[in-house]
Amino acid sequence: PTYDKVAKDLEGTMNVTVRNMPLSSHKNAVPAAQAVQAAELQGKHLEMANKLFQTQDSWKGITNKQTELRGLFLSYAQELGLDTEKFKTDLVDPKTIELIKGDFEYGQKIGVKGTPQFAVNDKPLENVDSSTSAEDMAKEFKKAAGLN
């Protein structure tokens, strides 16, 4: 995805981070955020986030969160080469939930209204979304950071 390329291209120029913003309109947003956060603890948050976006249609309607949804996310963790035992533990760790809550509160504080949303120096960018080209996205990030 475009964001991954931009993050790699800007490495050393800007600190690019991903934050969780599970929206209440998506009933499995919190478990998905937990999966991304658990993967982040093993250095693979972007990979997990991408996997979840790519496969969203297969899990967004799952109602059995304890078994079916966690099992599916565990299979994604295995595909990505994560330590699945650590992933299972981190997935339900209260610290994971607290990190997600912190990200959500931060997003609300700076005015994030949806996902994905991009922000630079605590200011959401209105003219950048997931359909923006990598080149234009990098330009907008640099411009917003005053790095032209």
Which residue ranges define each predicted feature?
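Structural alpha/beta surface segment adjacent to cysteine/selenocysteine redox centers
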Residues: 1-78, 140-144
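C-terminal cap of thioredoxin/glutaredoxin-like
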Residues: 1-7, 74-148
